[in-house]
Amino acid sequence: MLQPIGDRVIVEVKEVEEQTVGGIVLASNAKEKPTQGKVVAVGGGLYAEDGSKLPMTVQEGDEVLYDKYSGTKVKYEDKEYLVLHEKDILAIVK
């Protein structure tokens, strides 16, 4: 499995619906970019200026919302992941 470093988080991208509520099938270029996913790995965090370690807010298994233009796409073992900085995560879905 991929292990992020620093304040990076690996998110398994949640697939976007390919069909509208009305039954219209969307072309791949018409679909919205995903903005929700599941955290599958969390880095060790960053260090403050005084040397203390800053805790990560998200944990493995959290469902998160993120900005659609952030992160780097990575394909690993036939799955699509996004590598994000923790600051790019907007919210944890409870």
From Swiss-Prot:
Predominant cellular place of this UniProt entry's protein: cytoplasm
An annotated Gene Ontology molecular function: protein-folding chaperone binding
SMART domains from the UniProt entry: Cpn10
Top-level division of the source organism's lineage: Bacteria
Subcellular compartments: Cytoplasm
Keywords, ordered alphabetically: Chaperone, Cytoplasm
Task of the protein: Together with the chaperonin GroEL, plays an essential role in assisting protein folding. The GroEL-GroES system forms a nano-cage that allows encapsulation of the non-native substrate proteins and provides a physical environment optimized to promote and accelerate protein folding. GroES binds to the apical surface of the GroEL ring, thereby capping the opening of the GroEL channel.
Family statement: Belongs to the GroES chaperonin family.
Subunit structure: Heptamer of 7 subunits arranged in a ring. Interacts with the chaperonin GroEL.
Protein name, UniProt field: Co-chaperonin GroES
Organism classification: Bacteria, Bacillati, Bacillota, Bacilli, Lactobacillales
